Amino acid sequence: MVVNRALLASVDALSRDEQIELVEHINGNLAEGMHISEANQALIEARANDTDDAHWSTIDDFDKRIRARLG
């Protein structure tokens, strides 16, 4: 899986509500036939659904946790 660091940084900078809104927007676009890679969608959803912010202190921490989940 290729991790898009710019995407990770952008998503990580969003508030929890903004992250959830982004996931809903992505899901809506997918339903309409627009293509967003499954890996990028999984990264965004995992970040929006994670409530343990202590583990999200850096992009590298985020990368490691997502890779472990999708592994």
From Swiss-Prot:
InterPro entries: CHP02574_addiction_mod. GO terms for biological process: detoxification. The keyword Phosphoprotein does not apply. Coiled coil: none annotated. GO terms for molecular function: toxin sequestering activity. Keywords: Toxin-antitoxin system. Antitoxin component of a type II toxin-antitoxin (TA) system. Upon expression in E.coli neutralizes the effect of cognate toxin ParE2. This is Antitoxin ParD2. The gene is parD2.
